[in-house]
Amino acid sequence: GRMSRKLVALFLGVMLVFVALAIDITYVNATKGEKYERQVLSQTQQSYDSRTIPFQRGSITDRNGTILATSEKVYNVILDCKLANTTVKDEEKNDTHPYVDPTVAALVEYFGLDETDIRDRLTGETTKESQYQVLAREVSMDAKKAFEAYVDEYADKKNKELDENEQAEKAYRANIRGVWFEESYHRTYPLNSLACDLIGFTYSGDTADWGIEGYYSSILNGVNGRQFGYYNEDADMEQTIIEAQPGKNVVTTIDVNIQKIIRTAIENYNERIHVQNGADESDTETNRQTKAAKNIGVVVMDPNNGEILGMDSSDWYDLNNPRDLTPFYSQEEIDAMNDNETMEALSAIWKNYCISDAYEPGSTAKPMNVAAAYSLDVIDDNTLFDCEGFETIAGQMIRCGAYPGTHGVQTPADVLKNSCNAGMMQIGQKMGAAEFLRYQDIFGFGSLTGIDLPGEAYGLVHTEDTMGPTELATSTFGQGYTVTMVQQAAAFSSLINGGNYYQPHVMKTITDSTGAVVESNEPNLVRQTVSAEISDKMRSFLQGVVTDGSGQSAKVAGYTMGGKTGTAQKYPRGNGKYLVSFIGFAPVENPKAVVYAIVEEPDVENQANSVLAQEIVKEIYTELLPYLNVFPDDTDGVTGEGSETGTDDPNVAAPVQEDDTENSAENSNIENGGLTNAELDLINEE
């Protein structure tokens, strides 16, 4: 009946499922059965029969192929206790262990291992049968070869070729058993501390948090391989090897030669200041290596594509020994630190000052603000600004650097050349808060640049809600908001390259283990900040700063150069602490490199002296420009001797006092530009 037909149909359906399943199993067994069988069998083997084959982490090089970080092959010394403990009957049929003493002696002699530890492993209840005891890690290839040469010295020689003593030695060394070597890799940094902030370092296990090592860690890492054994149907051990896949290599935009130029300039600054302060001139190394300021930072950038050519700060640590605090603290200070304090001290050293620290830029911000005013058509070349030495804003006096003198009537070019705060405040009033903030955003302030390095800070800028007349006034000359060095360098580059804002970056290409390029980091044009016409104008204005204005000490004879000085009081105002800076470009007609230097709290009596930063930039350009195949042209008519005043006002004949700098104000609350103490502390922590 109908029920019988349903049962038959159900039965046939079930049978079809089983037939299909059987066919599938047969197919899998025929095509992949051996692979799966090996994997299952391998799970039952001891670690001696199944081990990880480590990958080789990719290298980091500079743009010319100089190795900055690489992984060298090293070896772990493994002892097969079971084999070394093999029992052999002597002539009297007694059990002996002839392999133990020769093996232990050789391990102690060639690897400096502890004899007691080895013997404890050979006799311990949980280890004496072990076939995998790691005795030493990361021994060199030379050490491995020396051990193997000792073991094999007589192995291929016949006894008749040896005298009696040599025959005995051959028999003795033949009893060295159970020692084998497991390949591993050790990360090494051939240039030690050079570019340490940029490169970063790895922890154990090829993990990293800092620098290029951290940002590109997943690219640099490869995939571990595996060697595993299994017993076949004849109970014979067979080995299968899945080779490790090496990591990719990162070719950076950095040029080691430029990095060395930067380092030398910072060292020369350190030595110069220490000797001026009475240090022993003969103690050259200490004078050069000990920073003569709270912080010093330098960025060298190609303004035409965003490539970072060099970047350095003054906390130099050895990438091969990054936890060594002795260059920075006394042993007593180190011993007194708890774990948290030690980690805080290390983190402060490891961070990249040029991207992680935000600060008030001071007058190096003025060129961007003048360019913004031109873009808004609120000023032109004929607009005049009358500097009376101060401006009264919202009932408060805010001084210019010329106070109690004046700069008089000035054009926009004069305002920049003289670094006149009064003129800048008048420009800010013409712009208005909303447009001023819009152009801060266009130039990238308050936003991440997106540089391919970890730990970049945002900086802190005002909003329309927090920017009143006073905040606008102080912001025009670079106080009351914060930036990072890389933000400032990228914004300034766009100002002088035709108005093109390129994303700063440190990776040029990524290559595989054969050297083939698998990824190229093409210049990323993010936006247009100003027109090409305004960019041309700003280059001309900034050239005037170097030839006739506050930046004369940065001038290199025979070259056309432009730039801007900065002297910013640190909070709280009036404490005598300053951050001085200079940002420059050369040559003016076709800029090849932007160089930006900061000296934070220099170790001098009068910190308000931008010449300290100008001298660093001048020294860098003196070496950098010929290296970039830019050669002197003496037709510019400038000697390059520079200004001796050390101020940002060429009309001031002597070094300014603490309250007479370009960014001084009468009221510290006004100087703060509306930022609270807590906000400024937060910025400094970033």
Question: What spans do the regions from the language model cover?
Answer:
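Periplasmic/cell-envelope proteins involved in peptidoglycan metabolism and beta-lactam response
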Residues: G1-Q331, A434-D441, K555, R573, ...
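Beta-lactam-recognizing serine transpeptidase/beta-lactamase-like catalytic domain environment
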Residues: A69, Y75, Y231-I241, I296-V599, ...
